[in-house]
Amino acid sequence: SNLCGHATLAAAHVIFEHLDFPEATIHFATRFVGPLTVTRSGDWLTLDFPAWQSEPAEPPALLLETLGITEYKEVRVARDYMVVMENQQQVEAVRPNIHAMIPLGKMVCITAPGDGEYDFVSRFFCPGEAVAEDPVTGSTHSMLIPYWAAKLNKTQMLARQVSERGGDLRCQLTGTRVYIGGQAVTYLTGKVLLR
């Protein structure tokens, strides 16, 4: 993929936490998606990513088969497939065969309106990758935020990725950009000795 939220967030976290970066915003120049910025506010880091519009799609039989579902509200496509479901319980209940998704040639996101404080929830499956279900996915929110902003008629939302580990994302749509807020923690520090 040409856009990776994990790497952007991790790089920003290291710059802010370990390199004593004095500003509140970091500007990254990227090869494929142009400039990306990350802004720090307390414990939260906000990524400024391009907004991706999705198109309605006729779901391939394999998509529904590998998700183990027959019912869905709609299927859309951008970089990834997006399968919209009725509610959060349906999203949590999916037990996909992720390896069998490889012939689809795309990653697969499932989403639905959220319960309680959450505007929407999602899960993200990565066929053929080392991590079969991504715990939290910044880049797929480039597609989810414009979709839910239009559906819910609001530009600021709280989302939850309901993977096993899970994570909250503060979401905002501003024109052709999305702002995705998340939290990062340092779990490992080490030294590399160059000889």
At which residue positions do the language-model features occur?
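Active-site proximal loop and beta-alpha junction motif in alpha/beta enzyme cores
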Residues: 1-195
